[in-house]
Amino acid sequence: MDKLELTIDGYKCFERKSEFNLNNITLFTGANSAGKSSVVQSLLLAKITSETIVEDVDLGIVPISLMNKKYSMELGNYDDIINRQTKTGDIDFSLSGIDYYIKGEKNDDVAKNTVVFSITPEMKNKLKNLFSNGFTYLCAERMAPHYEYQESEFNDICDCHGSNVGDVFSRYLGDDIIGSRSLNFTKGTKLLMQLDEWCNYIFPGIAVRVEKTGSQMYKLKMRNDVAPNVGFGITYALPILVSGLTIPEGGMLIVENPEAHLHAKAQSNMGYFLARMAAAGVRVIIETHSEHIVNGIRRMIVEGKTEMSHEDMTIYFFQNKNGEKDIIEITMDEFGNLSDFPEDFFDQIRQDTLAIIRTNRDRKEQENEKR
């Protein structure tokens, strides 16, 4: 799978042009409020633009609402997304050579929370085609445990909160998944069977069932227990598993905080799962604060059970340094070694351990001085 080159200029914290190469699997990690979510939002704006474009739009002028419920985006208005230091007042994006941008001049003909994207007719068709193989975005605020799920208008894919996962699962449970997404073939390749296998891999002893209780209602069951007996971790993870197993080859899966409510081993195994989906031809993009997610991905690639190469993973580490945004691209070699370990890149355990050692050493020295 070829990399997608994303460039951002003038959007939020991106005062100057910044480039990102979206690999088979790409991870955004690092400090809070350093730009990770803004990169994801740039992709969502591209997707929304591709959905809004229609053939009779003249001159490629596309009004886009910055308050988008489908993708759980509440960006405010133009003044909230423009970088105040940009000289032109424009916000420029490019995705795989497809340029789409927001002009800086005020337009009184559009609503307060709406901006106007400009894109040429040729580029608008390319943008449509770019997302034609499937697109799923799972935001950090996924569903909480509850008994039943209501059928959604977007019932062929999980919505951004995963609230319709029961319906999506029910729709595809008898379908075959792509073989390389199977954990193993002992139970066959049907979605229901493979979801059982992956659930048991991440949450030993857990199996998932969906029971239809009405024309638009489904009840989620885990083994023989009704859904509220299931913890947050499984509930948060289920939309990721179903989406990964059902999205078409060549599609894009964006997941925020896949580690939410999972213990360390489950986080690592979730990373392993996402890497397996990437190896099967899904472009996976992850925003995470978990070193266990990263290490699970590294483990899957190094094991060599798929054709996925170490060159198919890229990590972007975001930090605020001396009041400025700093982004470091980190790659991996064939042995799983990372190209860079900047300060604060998953080294908090080491920092805390050293702090404890120093504190205890100083305490002993003080006690000895008192004797």
Regions found by a protein language model. Name each.
Residues 255-258:
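Walker B catalytic motif
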Residues 11-13, 27, 33-34, 142-145, ...:
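Short, solvent-exposed loop/turn segments at secondary-structure junctions
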